[in-house]
Amino acid sequence: MIAYEVGGSGPSVVLVHGALSDRQHAFGALRPLLERHATVYALDRRGHGDSGDGGAYAPGREHEDVAAVLAAVPAPVDLIGHSFGALCALESARAGAAVRRLVLYEGVPRDGRTISPDGLANRVDALVRTDRPEAALDLVLTEVEHHGPAQLARDHRGRSWSESVAGVAVLARELEVENGYRFDPERYVGVTAPTLMLAGADSAASVRADAEAVAAGLPDARLTLLAGQRHACLHRAPELFADTVLEFLGY
């Protein structure tokens, strides 16, 4: 069962969160801003929050989950994905889910090995299986986010640390999906929904280059870099994110 929460009034908007997260952690600050203009459906991806895991995992099931929520809410529907949720959203649109407009924030790499190096998923899985979720999260933050000792100490003290640790249980499979992903514009010729590709202007150069390549490779997409932001824009500048998205959606 895929859980989702509904709030607001107006056109339908579906939100898809990324890894190490759930609907509340990812969108708690954003949802009230969007709900002034739209009916917002924030889902928990399978294995996260209140959603069940559903047995054997396959990436296509994530895309089917998003498509099922889209089909269950009043049309037309706009779809917003953050990080790994952006990849899920894009793949759902590619598979034929009915989307009026699509918003993606980072998370769609040209080559997923830049996000998830070879072997990382197996190392994370080994730590999780030996009941060391915090060590697994430290590994990812060190090798993917390049956090040094001082930043790791701040991470451990942060308000979202416990939620992130909880998300580690299914992180290895998400890293495996990213490791095998390559962006090929030919796969997305059928994604005709107008698309806004977002990235933080202060995100790593490789992340910005990924966003630029995706925007250039989709049939009807444009790129916007959010000033002063990195990957955590939803938490650090929800108003900026909301204003940018609402303008694109035309609400």
Predicted regions and their residues:
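Catalytic histidine-centered segment of alpha/beta-hydrolase-like enzymes
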Residues: 226-240
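Conserved alpha/beta-hydrolase "acid-adjacent" motif
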Residues: 204-210
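Active-site loop/oxyanion-hole signature of alpha/beta-hydrolase fold enzymes
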Residues: 41-80, 243
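Short beta-strand/loop motif that positions the catalytic acidic residue
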Residues: 191, 197-199
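Gly/Ala-rich beta-loop-alpha elbow adjacent to hydrolase catalytic centers
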Residues: 81, 85, 89
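Hydrophobic, aromatic-rich cap/lid helix
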Residues: 159-184
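Flexible "cap/lid" loop of the alpha/beta hydrolase fold
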Residues: 90-130
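Conserved HGGG/HGGXW glycine-rich cap/lid loop of the alpha/beta-hydrolase fold
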Residues: 1-52
